A protein has these predicted regions:
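Glycine-biased, small-residue-rich flexible motifs in mid-sequence functional cores and linkers
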Residues: 3, 74-265
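Short, positively charged patches
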Residues: 1-128
Length: 265
């Protein structure tokens, strides 16, 4: 099954998990799957609706969108082994930049969008101390993510940004130059096709990729019940090392980090 076929199935309404169901089934079958086969084995809620949407797709138009950026799928050799081992690994990823960075050792950095000066400085110091031995992976959000990417660049290191939009969408807009620079000189990844906007549920989905690419996750200024805390707890369940940076006990910004430290991070 080709990468475009995966993109088309998702465009017709299948979730990532449902696409994975199809790929696993197809792997064990020598014959090409019919549309009805795909609808059934995907376990989608409304097979008839999926098939109708699939048939209505304008292939010429969709292929133009698909070909705007290079991509790789879970079926390709370049797909990172660590990422393939997580729960619900992305079936398809679009990218800009140096794909070879995926083969190098990486550490993720996550944390608050509303970070403090102390939080940013803590991340900058740790990344400097790593001495460019690891690729810094983060989500290009405001706050800790931006501090992590910038620290990697300022110290002559390399960085990977995993974003929650299409590669042609800049969110936040303040990071447009940074995203463009990383895409040209380092690597930007997304499981969302061109034009896809920053929907709320995209960001926890993005976070699983950030953690999944790496054997370790550094977290700074995570509040309780924050997305960063959930990402770290999931990373721990996946067997990743989590390194929580302690912060002030006065403002609640690092309560999630302190919880992780109590749990053994």
């Amino acid at each position: 099954m080709k990468n475009y076929d995966i993109y088309k199935m998702k465009h017709a309404g299948l979730t990532n998990g449902q696409v994975l169901n199809v790929l696993r089934y197809a792997e064990n079958k020598e014959k090409e799957l019919s549309l009805r086969d795909i609808a059934v084995v995907s376990e989608c809620r409304n097979p008839a609706l999926f098939m109708e949407r699939y048939k209505q797709i304008d292939d010429d138009f969709l292929k133009k969108s698909f070909e705007e950026f290079p991509s790789f799928s879970i079926l390709d050799e370049i797909y990172p082994w660590d990422l393939s081992e997580i729960y619900n690994p992305p079936a398809l990823l679009f990218y800009q930049g140096n794909i070879d960075l995926l083969e190098l050792p990486k550490v993720a950095v996550v944390g608050s969008r509303d970070s403090s000066k102390l939080g940013n400085q803590s991340v900058q110091k740790i990344i400097k101390e790593l001495n460019n031995e690891l690729i810094i992976v983060s989500g290009l959000a405001r706050g800790i993510d931006t501090a992590a990417h910038m620290a990697a660049l300022q110290n002559g290191g390399r960085t990977i940004a995993v974003i929650g939009t299409g590669l042609d969408v800049f969110y936040p807009k303040a990071n447009k130059k940074l995203q463009s620079y990383i895409g040209k000189n380092h690597l930007v990844l997304s499981e969302y096709g061109p034009g896809e906007q920053p929907l709320k549920f995209h960001f926890p989905e993005r976070n699983r990729i950030i953690a999944g690419l790496c054997r370790g996750v550094i977290v700074a200024e995570a509040k309780m019940r924050s997305g960063s805390l959930i990402t770290c707890e999931r990373a721990m369940e996946e067997g990743r090392d989590v390194f929580a940076i302690p912060g002030s006990i006065l403002d609640g910004k690092s309560d999630g980090c302190h919880h992780l430290i109590q749990e053994g991070a």
